Amino acid sequence: AKTNFDGITYAKGASVLKQLVAWVGEDAFYEGARRYFAEHQFGATNLQDLLVALEGASRQELSSWKNAWLETSGPSTLSASWTTDAVGAITDFTLHQSGEACGGVLRPHRVTVSTWRVAAGALDRTHSFDVRIEGEQTPIDPDGVLAVPGGAASADLVVINDDDLTYAISRLDERSTDVALTYVASIDVALTRAVIWASLWNAVRDGLLDPRRFIVAVLTAVPAETEPAIRDRLLLFVAEAISSFLPGGLRTDVHDQVLATTIRLSRETQDADAWRSYTRAFIAEFAARGGDEYEATVRGFAASDNPDIAWRARRALAARGLVDAGVVEAWRSADGSGEAARMSVEALASLPIEEARSHAWDSVYSETLSNDFLTATLAGLQASSWDGEAGIEAAVDRLRSYWESHTIGMALRYANGVLAYGLDIDRDGSVERSVGLLRSWLDTNGDAPAQLRRIVIEHLDAFERDERVQRRWKQDQ
């Protein structure tokens, strides 16, 4: 169960339930739910009982809906196309569905497609279309609302799945992508902003949008972002865009820009939550790639009276080799909290010296670490700026034996911790130590536990995506 119920499981489950409500209609859904609870009170039920109640209330057949949504995996892909004539009228405004990412399955979707116009430097919604699609395509504007002279002027941006009603990858067209990157922060509806950012991020992950353009857009937009959850997620996306989707040769300039922008925002903001977000992003970027001119700033944060910020900065200094074990131990002695204990373990493991790394790897196999300390030790080893033999090949060789000799909780932490290293196509041997190593492991461990093979396959898939996207943008160097 631990390997099956993950973030994707819950996210898809919530999206599918939300889509079911949209598909049958909110009134029909609640009426069906009332019938369901009334008929089965104090009894045991299954999914079919709920669907029968919803079918009665909505007068829609739902067995095909269930088959398409609950017995298949992967997201649908939705996109839009249209034609603009000489007088600016939009015709053939069409919603398309691809099942390439979900085994060719074409699902029933009910979505909102909205159009937006740039006016006075901001985006205003002009139209909203309620669209149902079951096959490869369906018209978005059957009444021809936009099929009038000048209609295109009200569609600078086309947003698919605006109300986030379905589980799908929503593609922005080229013009909408350009407009979104420039003006997304001006949209006054947080959900729409989140949907647009998700579309842009999926384009980055699929090699369709240059990560550098995405990063610039995020750094420009986050000061105006009023939703902390969106702001924090975008800053995490920036870090991942650099480390996963840009080859090493393209990272330096972006890294410098991220450091300069996040520390500036940290100093300028008057909002405590925003300060924490920008400071964390700054420290994380410093930890990942350094920056001599910012060392004093990070040392200042290491002395902060905010324990979270202080320990993040201390861990960053350790990972860059700017403090030694004695300093980390002194910090630990001055802070008796459990979080300090965990962070100090991670900091010590991240020290880029052979003795510290050898001790950390020995502790991983010592059977003395708690769950949290195992995770912290592996995270420290991966975060280190150490440039020598990382010990990953030996750790991967022990995946199966560790899995079969430990509890599922420890085994999961070990497998995911060991495999959480990066890929850089510009670094000698990096592809072989990631893609090649895991392919070889899978070839020679065909009879390994299915749950373990699944974890390795998922990490291999991520490495293959990283390699594919990095090679796409290396061509533009």
Where are these regions (language model features)?
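Alpha-helical hydrophobic/aromatic positions enriched in membrane-embedded helices and signal peptides
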Residues: 4, 17-18
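Acidic, glycine-rich low-complexity/disordered segments
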Residues: 21-26
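A short, structure-level motif marking secondary-structure boundaries and short turns
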Residues: 2, 35-36
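Metalloprotease/metallohydrolase-associated module, dominated by Zn2+-dependent proteases
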Residues: 1-9
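Non-catalytic accessory/interaction domains
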Residues: 8, 13-16, 27-31, 38-477
